[in-house]
C-alpha cells in the first residue's frame, strides 16, 4: 500500500473547460440535502456552538453540533423552531440512549446523527446504530471514527449511512503519541484505502491544514471533509479569547483533552492558541472560491470531477505509477 499524506501529494491539472471558476459547482449532497461546500466544521466545543450551527444551517452549509455540556433534545427543538435542520452528536453510553428515548417521546427526529467516539470500530457503536435505526429510522446516521477498510465494511453493514475516517491526525490530537495507533502522518492514504471498499459517503476527519487539502480529500474518496483548526479562531468561535504580546488568540483544544473533560483522565488531545482569523463567513467564501479553482484545474465543472485527475507523490521515484488510478 502506498503511504502518503496531504503534504507530499499534488494533483495534476487537466485541460480547463470553463472561462471562470465561478462556473464550477462546489456543492455536495449528503443524505436528503445539498450543501454549498464539502466541508463541515469539527464538532468540537472550541469550533461550533448553537449560534454558529444555526448560521451555517441557514446559509446552506452542513454542520455537526458537539455533544459536550449540551441538551441535545432542546437543541433539536430550537433548530427546528428556527426552520433549520438538526444535526447532533451522540456517544455510546447510557445518557446517549436516554437522549434517543427523549427525542422519540417528544416526537423529534434530528435529520443527522453522528455517533462520535475516538475508536468507532466497536460493538458499542454497532449497538447504538441498531438502536437509532429502530427508534429514529428517518435520521441519517454518520458513524466513526475509523481507519481501516474492515471498519468501513462493518459500519456500513451495521446500518451507518456514512462513515467518518481519521484516528488522531488532527492538529490538537495526540492519540498517536499516547497510544501508538492512528492515521496521523498517513491520513490521505487511509482515506484512499477505506474509500476502495466504501459504498456510502465518507467524511474525512482531521489533518486538513490548507484549502487545497479539501480537493485532495475529494480526489481520494471523501464526500465531505471535517475541519477543526482552520475553522477555530474566528471572531465568532466559542473558544476563549487570549491576548499574548498584544496579539489576540482563541483557545482550540481536542475533544479528548483535559481542557474539554475538565479533568486529567485519559487525555488524547491538547490545547493550542489560534490567531484570530476574522469572520467565519469570509473564510467560507474563500474556501468556496478555492474549491471552485480546484474543480477548474481538474478540467471539470462539478466537485466530483476532481476524482478523475492523476497525482504525484513527492519524493517518490516518478509520477507514472500514479497515472489513471
From Swiss-Prot:
The keyword Cell inner membrane does not apply. Gene3D superfamilies: Aldolase class I. NADP(+) binds at residues 202-225. One of its GO terms (molecular function) is GMP reductase activity. It comes from the Bacteria. Pfam families: IMPDH. It is an enzyme of class 1 (oxidoreductase). PROSITE patterns: IMP_DH_GMP_RED. InterPro entries: Aldolase_TIM, GMP_reductase, GuaC_type_2, IMP_DH/GMP_Rdtase_CS, IMP_DH_GMPRt. It catalyses: IMP + NH4(+) + NADP(+) = GMP + NADPH + 2 H(+). One of its GO terms (cellular component) is GMP reductase complex. GO terms for biological process: purine nucleotide metabolic process. Coiled coil: none annotated. Keywords: NADP, Oxidoreductase. SUPFAM superfamilies: Inosine monophosphate dehydrogenase (IMPDH) (SSF51412). Its EC number is 1.7.1.7. NCBIfam families: GMP_reduct_2, PRK05458.1. Belongs to the IMPDH/GMPR family. GuaC type 2 subfamily. Catalyzes the irreversible NADPH-dependent deamination of GMP to IMP. It functions in the conversion of nucleobase, nucleoside and nucleotide derivatives of G to A nucleotides, and in maintaining the intracellular balance of A and G nucleotides. This is GMP reductase. It comes from Paracidovorax citrulli (strain AAC00-1).
Amino acid at each position: 500500500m502506498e503511504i502518503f499524506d496531504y503534504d507530499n501529494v499534488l494533483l495534476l491539472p487537466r485541460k480547463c473547460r470553463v472561462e471562470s471558476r465561478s462556473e464550477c459547482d462546489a456543492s455536495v449532497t449528503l443524505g436528503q440535502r445539498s450543501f454549498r461546500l464539502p466541508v463541515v466544521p469539527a464538532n468540537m466545543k472550541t469550533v461550533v456552538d448553537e449560534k454558529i450551527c444555526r448560521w451555517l444551517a441557514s446559509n446552506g452549509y452542513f454542520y455537526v453540533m458537539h455533544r459536550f455540556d449540551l441538551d441535545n433534545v432542546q437543541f433539536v427543538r430550537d433548530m427546528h423552531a428556527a426552520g433549520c435542520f438538526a444535526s447532533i452528536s451522540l456517544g455510546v453510553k447510557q445518557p446517549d440512549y436516554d437522549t434517543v428515548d427523549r427525542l422519540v417521546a417528544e416526537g423529534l427526529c434530528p435529520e443527522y446523527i453522528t455517533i462520535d467516539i475516538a475508536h468507532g470500530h466497536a460493538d458499542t457503536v454497532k449497538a447504538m446504530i441498531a438502536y437509532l435505526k429502530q427508534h429514529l429510522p428517518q435520521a441519517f446516521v454518520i458513524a466513526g471514527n475509523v481507519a481501516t477498510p474492515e471498519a468501513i465494511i462493518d459500519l456500513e453493514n451495521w446500518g451507518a449511512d456514512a462513515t467518518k475516517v481519521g484516528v488522531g491526525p488532527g492538529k490538537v490530537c495526540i492519540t498517536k503519541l499516547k497510544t501508538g495507533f492512528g492515521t496521523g502522518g498517513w491520513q490521505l492514504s487511509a482515506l484512499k484505502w477505506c474509500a476502495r471498499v466504501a459504498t456510502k459517503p465518507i467524511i474525512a476527519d482531521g489533518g486538513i491544514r490548507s484549502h487545497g487539502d479539501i480537493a485532495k480529500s475529494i480526489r481520494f474518496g471523501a464526500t465531505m471533509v471535517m475541519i477543526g483548526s482552520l475553522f477555530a479562531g474566528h471572531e465568532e468561535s466559542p473558544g476563549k479569547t487570549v491576548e499574548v504580546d498584544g496579539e489576540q488568540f482563541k483557545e482550540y483544544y481536542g475533544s479528548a483533552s483535559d481542557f474539554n473533560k475538565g479533568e486529567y483522565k485519559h487525555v488524547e488531545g491538547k490545547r493550542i492558541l489560534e490567531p484570530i482569523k476574522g469572520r467565519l463567513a469570509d473564510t467560507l467564501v474563500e474556501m468556496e472560491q478555492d474549491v471552485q479553482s480546484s474543480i477548474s484545474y481538474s478540467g471539470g465543472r462539478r466537485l466530483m470531477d476532481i476524482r478523475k485527475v492523476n497525482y504525484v507523490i513527492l519524493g517518490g521515484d516518478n509520477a507514472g505509477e500514479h497515472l489513471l488510478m
